[in-house]
């Protein structure tokens, strides 16, 4: 039995010129039927609305269904070039000219990030996120390769607070109008499309805080800090 499972999260049809080993060993997962050149595909059943939670939906499903100790997750447009073989790997950090907080405020919505931080019930977590948002670095995209246990810890830190926050959003328009976000995100030309991305915008920043503040080391050599008991 293999000790790893490789997944590709697919929102749309894709038929890339991927090598045969990739087509044979990666399993496509989606919330609706999509076409691909992968050998195996699964349409997942979920309690979450994919329009609101994006990749968090898939991670939740993987944690409930994956039977191997190691896992890799790829986006259908961003793929790892080999199966998972060892320690956690994630996207390369990108240095920012401004803090992650100011970057989010300018590109998306200051009110959105302020409201999210205010919604955090745990004071230690709120302090950690507030300080983490002052970093001038971001780890983008949605690639992961490593132990399923680390993915579960990521989920507890990143996904759970976002899910609770999303449940409380009554009107996304206040975030869209406040920042002119639809003008910046020209491809997402209405508030419904923007709403689909809110969880993704937040999870990208929370993921950065998880890897840089909750974990230590560098990509490929990640170990959890023992003093973060709230995870």
Stretch-by-stretch model annotation:
Residues 1-231:
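ER/Golgi luminal nucleotide-sugar-dependent glycosyltransferases, focusing on the catalytic module
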């Amino acid at each position: 039995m293999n000790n790893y499972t490789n997944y590709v999260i697919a929102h749309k049809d894709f038929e890339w010129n991927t090598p045969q080993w990739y087509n044979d060993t990666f399993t496509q997962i989606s919330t609706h039927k999509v076409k691909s050149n992968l050998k195996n595909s699964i349409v997942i059943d979920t309690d979450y609305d994919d329009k609101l939670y994006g990749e968090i939906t898939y991670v939740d499903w993987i944690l409930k269904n994956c039977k191997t100790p190691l896992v890799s997750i790829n986006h259908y447009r961003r793929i790892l070039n080999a199966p998972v073989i060892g320690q956690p790997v994630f996207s390369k950090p990108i240095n920012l000219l401004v803090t992650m907080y100011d970057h989010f405020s300018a590109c998306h919505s200051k009110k959105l990030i302020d409201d999210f931080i205010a919604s955090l019930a745990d004071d230690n977590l709120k302090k950690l996120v507030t300080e983490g948002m002052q970093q001038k670095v971001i780890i983008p995209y949605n690639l992961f390769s490593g132990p399923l246990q680390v993915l579960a810890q990521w989920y507890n830190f990143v996904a759970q607070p976002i899910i609770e926050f999303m449940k409380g959003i009554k009107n996304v328009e206040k975030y869209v109008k406040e920042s002119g976000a639809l003008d910046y995100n020209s491809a997402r030309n209405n508030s419904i499309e923007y709403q689909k991305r809110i969880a993704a915008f937040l999870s990208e920043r929370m993921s950065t805080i998880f890897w840089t503040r909750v974990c230590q080391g560098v990509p490929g050599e990640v170990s959890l800090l023992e003093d973060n008991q709230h995870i």
